[in-house]
Amino acid sequence: MNFGAFILPNGKLKHEIMFWKGLVESNYPDQFYTKHLPHLTLLNIKVRDINLALKKTMKTINDYNSFHIRIEKKGVFWNDFGTHGGHTLFYEVKKNQYILNLQKVLAESLTSEVIRRKASIYKEDYEMDLSYKKYGSPFIGEQWIPHFSVASLNKQKNNPVIIKFLEKSINFRFDVMKITFWKIKKNNHFFLDSIDLR
């Protein structure tokens, strides 16, 4: 079972993400991520004990301050290996040192709890391989692209929904006031707890 730490979007961004999720679902039912709640994943790691992971991470960021994020562009992870080659539509968060440090601190608090595969599947990418071996996730560090996913379409790259998604420019900004924690079982997310940032 996996343990997740998420940032949830504010009202306007959440509304837009839900619009696109609905559009994808109505045109192409059962695509990856369509039915997931809108969120930015700080961590998604397989752990030995969910409750201990929750306790450790909440203690680690108990004194963290709230921070500002900007979402100024959309993108696509083409041929996303995490969705068996689907094209994942996302809203990219402008990377800043604060969110990178927050992710790293959370990941480091769980290194003793992580369950890793015996052999890494990320050997072709040095940074991802190193991250997986240390943290149990390939996306901890500078190679991580903070984002809010919409859906992953198993369709052609020139699909009209993908083209339409990329056309419109965006500009969202909001203060992150809370981190939420989740138990993740395949496509299901079960809320565990949250912590308010100062």
Place the predicted regions along the sequence by residue.
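Basic, often amphipathic N-terminal segments
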Residues: 1-71, 76-79, 96-175, 190-198
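Acidic/polar active-site rim loop that often engages polyanionic ligands
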Residues: 83-87
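Short histidine-centered catalytic/ligand-binding loop motif
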Residues: 88-95
